[in-house]
Amino acid sequence: NLDCINFPMRKTKIIATLGPPAEDPKILIKLLEQVDVIRINLAHGTWDKRDPDNHTDKIKNVQKIAKTIKKPIAILVDLKGNKIRIGDLIKQTIDLKKDSIINVRFTDERVARSIDEIVVNAGYVFENIEKEDIILIDDGLIKLLVNETDDENQTLACTVQEGGLLSRRKGFEVIDKVITKSGLGEEDQEDLRKLAALNVDWVALSFVNQASDVNQAREVLSSIDNQMRVIAKIERLSALKQLYWIIKASDGVMVARGDLALESGPGELTGLQKTIINQTVAGKKIVITATQMMESMKTSRVPTRAEVFDVSNAACSGVDAIML
């Protein structure tokens, strides 16, 4: 009985991340009939119109079908931000076995050369990594221990501590080290202009550290006379120190639990989520809870009890939307 919760209940919206199956118009229609917002992540796919997975077509298809079914569907797009990601693998996926050796090479090349190699297109990161550092990939699902560093070839020889199936473009982090740059890069600024031309409703800024990051996006939009609304993704502990000002500068915030948990540890995440939600609600701004909500339904038709509780708890906490 939710009436026992001493909190003004809201009609929590559903945000759905657009995946490859939704490229089928029939599936996309069914999806749009059930959700309120479609989210597109610019970290996956390209702007190249020759690419069937290009961003422009995805956005226009959603807008076209929403108009056809006469349902107002908002579009939320995540900018890439400065998050470090691995490049393309030599195969669609590789199976990293526990205790096996994998090389991480920092290079401008976008594709790995072999089955036992991962590439990262951020050379400056190599200088910050040392022997015995712990690397986390794909929100910590893959865990590597750095055994050796090869300065000449900018390569790390690593042992797989936690393995599993790995696919391309997954996030790359190093425990206890900040390797992402703050602010809006040139590519993000250009992407913002493209999204404005496509009449996107919301943009989510990745790895916001301070209010000036949000203001920078506002300045870009203002220069082209666009009023797109801005969501600040809270993914860094450093952002919590500036949370009041970030909330004030933005139209809303997203509790991006994947990267936030990597910094805080899973034990602290519940309290941090509550803090972010409460402060955002108090500031009368939009708040979204994201990452691994109903995650098991990628492979199961029924969510786990823990997932049901997670979604219900977020709704009871006063979030405006949950993101799948």
Enumerate the predicted regions with their spans:
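Non-catalytic helical/linker scaffolds that mediate oligomerization, partner binding
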Residues: 2-324
